[in-house]
């Protein structure tokens, strides 16, 4: 019989003894301060030696052409690397890199996705956004994201589901303003474009490390940035189908700098990603659980059951 490490057992006992637990909107709501590890948990802090090990952790690295991004551009598995964290000795981070010279053939983007089995509960990730390219001239409409998505079977598919965090340091989509989008989708048609969603925008620079969190119940999506509540989405904009947890880094159509010259190279780093199935956890709860997992040297765990019947993960919608 397997046993939790000591610190996690102590946290679990604290929940049983001290936490007030209620059932609401189809999820278990764990009050602030109740930081025990949930039974259905996915956590990955990307402590892999090389990208080839990501598949064993359930990740798929996108390789090929397709939506989104510049026409003619491609997604490359080689655009995903793992490196030592210069700010935390012993820690590793996953890095997505995208570059463009303003042409489709000169554009490479990055994307990875996990298994398609996530719906209600709490999603969180710690991400480093970048306002400027690592090299090259600044100004291209780069999109830096963390999201969960179910495939679009056809235009305006009623079962389409998507939750997005998208950072636009150089603007894009008709505006030059730096902003962070928090979006919960109802449905969409790709071509010609027509979308139905509920969106929140934070007009500020988010350069550097940030923790993004989403609480999903049957009736609402609550969004938090660095522990601060920023938006609530409800009604038909709440996810209805199991989704993949995904990250991507890509260039929006329209607004790229003139073609030619040295490639403009952008990075997005990911420290960890977390999902607690069917549990609404506060930002403080998630931070406490991540600290406990790391204290017990748990670099990856996945006890979230597969969808029934199993669903094929896809890195494109």
Give the positions of each predicted feature:
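Low-complexity, Ser/Thr/Pro/Gly-rich disordered linker/stalk regions
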Residues: 27-140, 144-151, 271-317
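Short edge-strand/loop segments of extracellular domains
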Residues: 142-159, 168-170, 228-229, 237
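Short tryptophan-centered beta-strand motifs in secreted/extracellular beta-sheet-rich domains
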Residues: 46, 123-125, 208-216, 221-223
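Glycine-aromatic-enriched beta-strand/loop faces of beta-sandwich-type recognition domains
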Residues: 154-208, 255
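Bacterial N-terminal signal peptides
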Residues: 14-26
